[in-house]
Amino acid sequence: MAITGVANLAVKVADLEGVVAFYRRAGAEVGDPEQWRNGRRADVHLGPLDLTLFTKAVYEDDVEGLAEEGFLHVALFTDDLDREVDGHDVVWGPEVVSGPSFGTRRIVFVDAPGQMRLEFMEQLEEPS
């Protein structure tokens, strides 16, 4: 693998505003919630740990039995997305996505043991 870093842990939440308020009270740096794809998202910075909160996973319609709330996936940066996907069962993607807080990335989600997924990402452009 040519993994170059961990981007974040993704968590699905039902009450995004309530969870954002919780992390702000806990002293985390939290970005404002924003619309993204099929739901809303917010980034949480807890020292060395980054979380991304989602109200709906982009791959939610493609994965059976996804919980209403809880851990979704670990997002990993790579310098060769195509090589990372080789040998994995792809759940969603690859696709180029953009957002104001993360720039432009090429991403793909694959199944992993433990009823979770891995997200492999190539950063194409930094946020402006």
What are these regions (language model features)?
Residues M1-G18, F71-V74, L124-S128:
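N-terminal beta-strand motif that seeds the catalytic metal site of vicinal oxygen chelate
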Residues V11-L51:
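Core segments of cupin and vicinal oxygen chelate
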Residues A67-W92:
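Mid-chain, well-packed structural core segment of small domains
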Residues A2, A42-D43, D86-S128:
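Vicinal oxygen chelate
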Residues L51-L53, F120:
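Generic preference for hydrophobic
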Residues E60-D61:
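A cross-kingdom feature marking solvent-exposed beta-strand/loop segments within repeated
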Residues G5, N38-R40, G70, T104:
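Exposed loop/turn and edge beta-strand positions of beta-sandwich/beta-sheet ligand-binding modules
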